[in-house]
């Protein structure tokens, strides 16, 4: 079993229409998408012979399927990962693949969004998460 739980928010201060820093984008996708795919590939090379006992869990988010204004990096990265794992599940029927979205969890991420996001609606949503104790 392998759990893919890596995740960073990316730049919350840039609007989607202003995402022009290719190096920043590359670094984000390297961590959140490309490295996950590379690690998963190595995992399968080693353990795929076990057949029915191989389980892959990708920790995803509602943001993978529902756009959230102010979170273009995060939403697009989660969407890319989720679709990668869906394709993998189609191709490798004997491998159990789970895209699991736990919902909002109270972590440092919530505080980071509240303090760093420039989108006020996004801040309000995350203030709501925090006040609900999620």
Regions found by a protein language model. Name each.
Residues 8-9, 22-24, 48, 53-80, ...:
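Catalytic loop of short-chain dehydrogenase/reductase
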Residues 99-102, 107, 115-134:
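C-terminal helical subdomain
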């Amino acid at each position: 079993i392998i759990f893919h739980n890596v995740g960073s928010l990316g730049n919350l201060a840039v609007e989607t229409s202003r995402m022009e820093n290719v190096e920043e984008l590359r670094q984000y996708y390297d961590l959140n998408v490309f490295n996950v795919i590379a690690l998963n590939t190595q995992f399968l090379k080693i353990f795929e012979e076990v057949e029915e006992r191989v389980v892959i869990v990708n920790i995803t988010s509602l943001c993978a399927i529902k756009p959230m204004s102010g979170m273009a990096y995060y939403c697009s990265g989660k969407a890319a990962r989720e679709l990668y794992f869906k394709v993998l599940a189609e191709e490798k029927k004997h491998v159990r693949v789970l895209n699991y979205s736990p919902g909002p969890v109270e972590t440092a991420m919530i505080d980071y969004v509240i303090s760093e996001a420039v989108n006020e609606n996004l801040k309000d949503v995350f203030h709501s998460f925090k006040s609900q104790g999620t």
